[in-house]
Amino acid sequence: MSTKMTPPVEKNEFIDVVFEDLTHDGAGVAKVKGYPIFVKNGLPGEEAQIKIIKVKKNFAFGRLMKLHTESPYRKDAECPVYNQCGGCQLQHLTYEGQLQAKEKQVRDVMQRIGGLADVPVHPVLGMKNPWVYRNKAQVPIGEREGGLVAGFYRQGTHDIINMESCLIQAEENDTLIQEVKRICEKHGITAYNEERNKGTLRHVMARYGQVTGEIMLVFITRTAELPNKKAIIEEIAAKFPEVKSIVQNVNTKRTNVIFGDKTTVLYGSEYIYDFIGDIKFAISARSFYQVNPEQTKVLYDKTLEYAKLNGNETVIDAYCGIGSISLFLAQKAKKVYGVEIVPEAIEDANRNAALNNMTNAEFGVGEAEVVIPKWYKEGVIADTMVVDPPRKGCDEALLNTIIDMKPNRVVYVSCNPATLARDLKVLEEGGYKTQEVQPVDMFPHTTHVECVAWLKLV
């Protein structure tokens, strides 16, 4: 007969603990008789008093009440709303400490999920200046005391924190959004009210080309009509000559989804342009484009290095998106085939290939695990396979396709170390050997870490 385990802690109890680790979302982990307790802002090695605030069968949540000892990596957060906004999770940890924590996270999942304890995991490639790196701001608009507020949602809520600036956001976007808020307020624009499904302006988005200096402004509205549109556009265009595109997206639905189906250019071009390395990209309101282009170049350079191309290879890029990695590879490969399930992304990929006069990149729409075997039957034999899947990792059918096709080399670009480790294990069981894993810090002060790994057929 089984006995029901009783958690060793109770709600509202005060206890002393030592934090052993960080979770994937940046909380400190302490254990009482092997029972884990998750505490926001706790750092490994610290001794602290905590208050138990929620007890579950297999874990509990606590609140940090008092530190008895401090980690040498602890620091005061630089953002004044750090503890309210959910955008960053690690500002209380020095940047050196963040990079070490991310490296440990990658090593741990390689061993625990992938069974790959012997695979070299290199130190994380970080930024010289880990601030003001984001080129896209997507800001909800609300009303308070008769005026407009623009900022970010309080962690775990839809309560908008009004922010004048964000320390990880390009200053150009911050400045523009604050002025747009003022101009809209002056012209009587009302904010969307989610509960009542009333009001006009839902979100404002700004996209900034870090190399070109061009900016796109997007109004996301509940109604097709934007009152005083002409005056608003004229004022913005006069004040910000770097704004090359103003776009309106209409979302009439009662939903948390930001974008609606209809997008209209109000001023200037449908696109702004930017460069990653020598490759030029056209960016529309809905385009996927990496938000940290400086570190994207680091990631893509490492991908190119791991692909070891000499100009004679055929490369397949699965989950190719707007063709950003494909075009990087096409600089060195004989031929690159990219596949992506989103038709609009492939339109962007073809546009970007033409923009760069690249004739050796070809793109197809569809599921990678369907399109790639079709190409194989048509005689497309990949020497190198590159995959850059979403957070859920590669589809099992695609991994089986790679194993069946037997390209000599596989380069795996990942935004989730856990699914990377899982998929590397499958590829190893199918005849590949993982050579090395390079983590890259694309999002300083958050818990996210990107990786690029390469495998060879053995």
From Swiss-Prot:
It is an enzyme of class 2 (transferase). The active site is at residue 415. It comes from the Bacteria. SUPFAM superfamilies: Nucleic acid-binding proteins, S-adenosyl-L-methionine-dependent methyltransferases. Belongs to the class I-like SAM-binding methyltransferase superfamily. RNA M5U methyltransferase family. InterPro entries: MeTrfase_TrmA_AS, MeTrfase_TrmA_CS, NA-bd_OB-fold, SAM-dependent_MTases_sf, TRAM_dom, TRM5-TYW2-like_MTfase, U5_MeTrfase_fam. [4Fe-4S] cluster binds at residues 79, 85, 88, 166. The keyword Cytoplasm does not apply. GO terms for molecular function: 4 iron, 4 sulfur cluster binding; metal ion binding; rRNA (uridine-C5-)-methyltransferase activity. PROSITE patterns: SAM_MT_RNA_M5U (PS51687), TRAM (PS50926), TRMA_1 (PS01230), TRMA_2 (PS01231). GO terms for biological process: rRNA base methylation. CDD domains: AdoMet_MTases. Its EC number is 2.1.1.-. S-adenosyl-L-methionine binds at residues 290, 319, 340, 388. Residues 8-66 form the TRAM domain. This is Uncharacterized RNA methyltransferase BC_0364. The keyword Metal-binding applies. Keywords: 4Fe-4S, Iron, Iron-sulfur, Metal-binding, Methyltransferase, S-adenosyl-L-methionine, Transferase. It comes from Bacillus cereus (strain ATCC 14579 / DSM 31 / CCUG 7414 / JCM 2152 / NBRC 15305 / NCIMB 9373 / NCTC 2599 / NRRL B-3711).
